[in-house]
Amino acid sequence: MKRRQFIYVVGLATASGGLAIACDTNPNQNQAAPELENELVVYSGRNEKLIGELIKQFEQQTNAKIQVRYGDTAELASAILEEGQNSPADVFFSQDAGALGALQKAGRTVQLPTSLLNQVDSAYRSPEGQWIGVTGRVRTVDYNTNLVKAEELPSSIFGFTDPKWKGRIAWAPTNGSFQSFVTGLRVAEGEERAKEWLEGIKANDPQVFPNNTSIVEALSRGEASVGFVNHYYLQRIKQDNPDVPVEHHFTEDIGSLVNVAGVAILNTANHPNIAQRFVEFMLNENAQNYFAGQTFEYPLAAGVEPKGNLKSLTQLQTQAKKIDLSNLNDLDNTLKLMQQTAVI
């Protein structure tokens, strides 16, 4: 799998201390080229539909020329490690915190200014100040309101291992966001509890789907009672069909894990000043409101509220165990556990 390959590359790069730089015998190449601060190279695990408009706005406001390499978050992180000191990337915009944590642990990210870090709660950025969350992506249990009453739903994600939920659950075990959740479950509750949960859900004969969207669509048709998803998929569907009989349920534990999409400036950045301005831009009020209204994610900069019928981040913080999101990089052991329990 792509994610497994990514973890192996991280380990290799960390052990070897990076890749060697090729030498050039041309003496004219020994002088460093002047930095052009109106240029920026971004490796983005967020697709163009999600951030393309903001990239255009940043270019217009700064008169900068932005080159964006879009792709899978894990593959791009692997590319940064493989490219070593020759990587053209200035900024890495990751779909999840795990990849950011992996690059930090490999020594590929730099300390961000305190003025930037202070804009986001410490729960959603690197404790060492090496990356920062831009938006929050919350795990929820969505449910069909015609099949389940709100008061029937357990306050803990472990409550869904109860046999009364047999045949009523939808999940997507091969989906990256679900695997990140299982990693968070391992970090917060330990290996044995995570194993118990996976085995308990599997014993309840859950319906298997490829992704979050298909789960929410199945819930809307009454094909399942509850499903484990990220919050914004329902928000997007309700934008076009507000009468869909599906609502969010936020458990009072790691079941409401807040993962982040975030950014880091690389230690090989050729354009560090414009890179910092890019991070500042993604955290400004305009960009944060764009994410809240267009992608339905949680804005992480202080003072900007989420859209829709969502719990506040403050409420979610008090419910879910706080973990260092950088530790969500250990997907390899998550995949091993999921294989061991025959979930994948």
Predicted segments with their positions:
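Short, polar/charged alpha-helical segment
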Residues: 36, 41-65, 237
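N-terminal export signals
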Residues: 5-25
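Periplasmic-binding protein-like
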Residues: 167-173, 281-305
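A bilobed periplasmic-binding-protein/Venus flytrap-type ligand-binding module shared by bacterial periplasmic
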Residues: 140-147, 259-271, 290
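Extracytoplasmic ligand-binding site segments that recognize negatively charged/polar headgroups
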Residues: 37, 44-52, 71-75, 81, ...
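A ligand-binding cleft/hinge motif common to bilobed small-molecule-binding domains
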Residues: 98-102, 225-245
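Short, low-complexity, disordered segments immediately C-terminal to signal peptides
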Residues: 24-38
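An extracytoplasmic/periplasmic, membrane-proximal ligand-sensing/linker region
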Residues: 192-194, 297-344
